């Protein structure tokens, strides 16, 4: 056990926080849930219609599925369904299941576009775009989201806040 070498996290979260270290998965999972809630508040506070304020569940093939983000953009009237992910590096079976969920939930909602939203990356790296686009799935980052909602902050302020305010709190928690 002494010789086990911890692996560096592949989550974009650490990059967004300006940290380069090993991570505690439970802290990252909780962070992911909280940042999802944050972006739903941003959408609700914008001119776009947040379609999950009352209910974030939809029935798909007899099962209840959680909706991370669903909104009608005030700029283009497009109905978006977004699955929030801070990490796009999951195994091939999970990729297939997650991609399938996006398609099924998008169809159940009658959304125009179903995609991943990575709330800890400004723009999605080309390798990830290619990987997911080749499977017929779009992936968006913060810069894209801020182009669709009239947030009360700009991208630089968001990432500065993550690094300077959120990161020290998570470090104190053990990240």
Where are these regions (language model features)?
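Interdomain/boundary linker segments immediately adjacent to catalytic/signaling cores
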Residues: 1-47
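Short, well-structured beta-strand/strand-turn elements
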Residues: 46-59
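An acidic- and aromatic-residue-enriched active-site/binding cleft used to recognize and process polar
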Residues: 56, 85-87, 120
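Active-site beta-strand-loop-beta-strand hairpin of nuclease catalytic cores
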Residues: 64-82
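Hydrophobic beta-strand segments of well-ordered beta-sheets in folded domains
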Residues: 78-81, 110-121
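Short beta-strand-loop-alpha-helix junction that forms the active-site gateway
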Residues: 84-95
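Well-ordered, non-membrane alpha-helical segments in soluble/globular domains
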Residues: 95-103
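Domain-level recognition of nuclease-like catalytic cores that cleave nucleotide substrates
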Residues: 116-175
